[in-house]
Amino acid sequence: MGVSAVLLPLYLLSGVTSGLAVPASRNQSSCDTVDQGYQCFSETSHLWGQYAPFFSLANESVISPEVPAGCRVTFAQVLSRHGARYPTDSKGKKYSALIEEIQQNATTFDGKYAFLKTYNYSLGADDLTPFGEQELVNSGIKFYQRYESLTRNIVPFIRSSGSSRVIASGKKFIEGFQSTKLKDPRAQPGQSSPKIDVVISEASSSNNTLDPGTCTVFEDSELADTVEANFTATFVPSIRQRLENDLSGVTLTDTEVTYLMDMCSFDTISTSTVDTKLSPFCDLFTHDEWINYDYLQSLKKYYGHGAGNPLGPTQGVGYANELIARLTHSPVHDDTSSNHTLDSSPATFPLNSTLYADFSHDNGIISILFALGLYNGTKPLSTTTVENITQTDGFSSAWTVPFASRLYVEMMQCQAEQEPLVRVLVNDRVVPLHGCPVDALGRCTRDSFVRGLSFARSGGDWAECFA
């Protein structure tokens, strides 16, 4: 893929909390690309948890993400999060009210706080930002180029969860995919453009493997909220005290401090200068504070939708069983979150394709990653102390579900192997498979991979959803 060096926070590799300086302004051609994603201001922007833009982890992959010599990909599937969005409507109202309150009560706006005096909250709500749209265009380009032996001759089957921003993401992916295909002189002529073939409702009563919501006990769980509150209390009070001292007259809650930190990402990705200018909200906090913020987001995902929640991985079981069906060209066997009407029809769940793309949200993807056992090597995350990426065995919210994240599942036929091999990449990082005899390149044979997904094939702990 011709990747270049990636500047990542040093703490991710060593736990050290100081790093290299990042220039105040970067040219888009060097810091925001199809191959590498968003490398602008990486010492800060890669610490935004799930609010980080997609950035490639190819150079963080111990195993090369390139297709091994002597192998050809015979099946490829991408599961993508939607692109960068504006704050949700409910959060946006809270952000706006907080800024207005600061403007009304602060008696001084000195130095790095000066922008707050006249800052006008005018961000949209819920939908993709223009930057987020381009992320998905780039994703479609990259998917086409990576799997061009397939994409030149095959129209992918595409599904989307029912949210407008997820559907829009799928359409932008198609735009990038098809524009690249039309420029490829070796592409098979006369093929139709891809389209979103299935949109799955996100109504609370609907079965939706891309965005499950019918497991009552899980939906009522407050575990992640408790973990979030407890870890917030370990690092935010000192920030709050500093902000209140610097903004005389202002009184903040710990939650409001994290809102100001959220604004660093949202204000940056909502502007046309996303590649050359970092939001002034970002400078209100230190590098160490961003490390804690990033870890806080990882805790929320791990204890909300991952293995830290007793029913977290079970929410991804339906999708795992759909993947098994696609890999083996056999009917879906699942009684959890799958939609039997859709999955039993070749029109809405074909079993004979070799190229698939699905679009969803971060929470559902986290559950799917754990249902597939990709982070079985991750021990329960400490709820009191920041752990680096080595200690978490490669898990963090920024490394798994940034905006426009992508999970690639590949099946390949290799000259030295009789059986097809399966491997998985998360944001260009090869994640060695668990639960099956894995080779030096992180792969298992298809049949052993399927056997290893016994948790998914047995329905996980779905019976506990309604206890």
Curated annotation (Swiss-Prot):
Enzyme class: hydrolase
Pfam families hit by this protein: His_Phos_2
Localisation: Secreted
A single cellular component GO annotation: extracellular region
Thermal dependence summary for this entry: Optimum temperature is 55 to 60 degrees Celsius.
Annotated S-S bridges: C31-C40, C71-C414, C215-C465, C264-C282, C436-C444
EC number: 3.1.3.-, 3.1.3.8
Biotechnological relevance of this protein: Phytic acid is the major storage form of phosphorus in plant seeds and, thus, in seed-based animal feed. Phytases are therefore of considerable economic interest.
Active site (UniProt): H82 (nucleophile)
Residues that bind 1D-myo-inositol hexakisphosphate: Q50, Y51, R81, H82, R85, T88, R165, D211, K301, H361, D362
InterPro entries: Acid_Pase_AS, His_Pase_clade-2, His_PPase_superfam, Histidine_acid_Pase_euk
Keyword Secreted carried by entry: yes
GO MF, one example: acid phosphatase activity
Induction: Expression is induced at low extracellular phosphate levels and the presence of phytate is not required to induce phyA expression.
Residue positions the entry lists as glycosylated: N105, N207, N339, N376
Catalytic activity annotation: 1D-myo-inositol hexakisphosphate + H2O = 1D-myo-inositol 1,2,4,5,6-pentakisphosphate + phosphate; 1D-myo-inositol 1,2,4,5,6-pentakisphosphate + H2O = 1D-myo-inositol 1,2,5,6-tetrakisphosphate + phosphate; 1D-myo-inositol 1,2,5,6-tetrakisphosphate + H2O = 1D-myo-inositol 1,2,6-trisphosphate + phosphate; 1D-myo-inositol 1,2,6-trisphosphate + H2O = 1D-myo-inositol 1,2-bisphosphate + phosphate
Complex formation: Monomer.
Similarity remark: Belongs to the histidine acid phosphatase family.
Cited function: Catalyzes the phosphate monoester hydrolysis of phytic acid (myo-inositol hexakisphosphate), which results in the stepwise formation of myo-inositol pentakis-, tetrakis-, tris-, bis-, and monophosphates, as well as the liberation of inorganic phosphate. Myo-inositol 2-monophosphate is the end product. Has a broad substrate specificity and is also able to dephosphorylate other classic acid phosphatase substrates such as p-nitrophenyl phosphate, phenyl phosphate, and fructose 1,6-bisphosphate.
Protein name per the record: Phytase A
Source organism of this protein record: Aspergillus niger
